[in-house]
């Protein structure tokens, strides 16, 4: 299993600043260099809700403080804890596009995930993201033109391992399939608890 690196990212006033990996690890309480399964377990045990960025493929953030831009790809997961299922892991993909960095480690993994989505659900539209208070129209204007999958296509990929990019589409379909057993077990357990409470009451 490949290693993953947690990191935080701030893009403000046209300057991209990458927080240190150690600070991100301290915040989330997951040891640096943990495997994918290890930090998923840690997050799940904490009942964590929110977003965390992960790097996969052995490439660190490329930062140019001189020009106030950065250039790299992102693969990140969004995790939320629910009462009816185990923690649900969603993946959304965003990545930078310039000729200079198009072949950095990990870019192929991002492309593979997007390709699988497109094969099943149609073309995934790429749009420009705000940078420094404006939409970057010209890649030569700023190397920090970040592209991401358009939100309205509702791309939520339940993820089954970065090693081979196994992907299934998220949403109700996945909840009804992958997690239905857990949902049923939870519902049965709660129903029994309620029944026990009622049988022991005066009502």
Task: Report each predicted region and the residues it spans.
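Sec-dependent N-terminal signal peptides
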Residues: 4-14, 18
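Sterically constrained small-residue positions within well-ordered secondary structures
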Residues: 11, 70, 82-84, 136-138, ...
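Non-cytosolic coordination micro-motifs
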Residues: 21-60, 95-203
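Mid-chain, structured segments of secreted extracytoplasmic proteins
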Residues: 62-111
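Intrinsic disorder/low-complexity segments
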Residues: 17-19, 82, 125
């Amino acid at each position: 299993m490949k290693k993953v690196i947690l990191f935080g990212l701030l893009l403000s006033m046209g300057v991209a600043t990458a927080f240190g990996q150690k600070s991100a690890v301290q915040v989330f309480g997951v040891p640096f260099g943990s495997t994918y399964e290890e930090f998923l377990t840690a997050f799940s045990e904490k009942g964590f809700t929110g977003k965390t960025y992960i790097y996969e493929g052995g490439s660190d953030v490329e930062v140019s403080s001189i020009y106030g831009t950065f250039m790299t790809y992102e693969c990140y997961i969004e995790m939320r804890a629910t009462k009816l299922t185990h923690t649900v892991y969603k993946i959304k993909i965003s990545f930078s596009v310039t000729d200079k960095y198009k072949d950095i480690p990990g870019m192929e993994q991002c492309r593979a995930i997007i390709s699988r989505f497109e094969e099943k659900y149609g073309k995934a539209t790429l749009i420009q993201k705000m940078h420094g208070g404006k939409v970057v129209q010209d890649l030569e204007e700023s190397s920090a033109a970040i592209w991401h999958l358009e939100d309205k296509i509702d791309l939520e990929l339940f993820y089954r391992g970065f090693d081979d990019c196994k992907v299934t589409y998220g949403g109700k379909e996945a909840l009804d399939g992958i997690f239905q057993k857990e949902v049923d077990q939870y519902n049965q357990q709660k129903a029994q608890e309620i029944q026990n409470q009622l049988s022991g009451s005066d009502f």
